[in-house]
Amino acid sequence: MSKVKKKSTSTGTIALNKRAKYDYFVDQKFEAGLVLSGWEVKSLREGKAQLVDAFVIIHQNEAWLVGARITPLLSASTHVVCEPMRQRKLLLNRKELERIIQVTEQKGKTCAAMALYWKGNKIKCEVALVTGKKEHDKRDTERDRDWSRDKERLMKHNA
């Protein structure tokens, strides 16, 4: 008899960093694994994560996710210290890591966390090489978004 595989109840996106799309121009994206502890995985299954000010730093040729908040569950173990804002190691291959190091050394460039999501039974983090937007760039983006919204409304109303 064959065993029936139990499907995971957690699927898709865990957390998005919408603020990063507003504040930065996205140049290139990478998919990275995360080194997590047990309580963090349980919290992520419940969707208790925030990436609002999350970014990537390079320390001793290793990538670290800084500023990501994973809130512990109320039922978390009492003998394990749960630190919601700790730095988490990112798992990238050598070429991706060298590319991130090379680009982030340039002025105005940084690496930001864009999303946390499930891929199979693994948790992945989408990191992107980004360039900061100026204030007028943000206004242009908002103006374009408003115009496309109005355009859709007009097309829907006329049809």
Curated annotation (Swiss-Prot):
Keywords from the named record: Cytoplasm, RNA-binding
Coiled coil: none
Region of interest called Disordered, as start-end residue ranges on this chain: 134-159
InterPro entries (UniProt xref): SmpB (IPR023620), SsrA-bd_prot (IPR000037), SsrA-bd_prot_CS (IPR020081)
CDD domains: SmpB
GO biological-process terms attached to the record: trans-translation
Cellular component GO terms held in the UniProt record: cytosol
Entries under SUPFAM superfamilies matching the protein: Small protein B (SmpB) (SSF74982)
Top-rank lineage group of the source organism: Bacteria
Job description of the protein: Required for rescue of stalled ribosomes mediated by trans-translation. Binds to transfer-messenger RNA (tmRNA), required for stable association of tmRNA with ribosomes. tmRNA and SmpB together mimic tRNA shape, replacing the anticodon stem-loop with SmpB. tmRNA is encoded by the ssrA gene; the 2 termini fold to resemble tRNA(Ala) and it encodes a 'tag peptide', a short internal open reading frame. During trans-translation Ala-aminoacylated tmRNA acts like a tRNA, entering the A-site of stalled ribosomes, displacing the stalled mRNA.
Record HAMAP family: SmpB (MF_00023)
The protein's name: SsrA-binding protein
Organism: Marinomonas sp. (strain MWYL1)
Encoding gene, per UniProt annotation: smpB
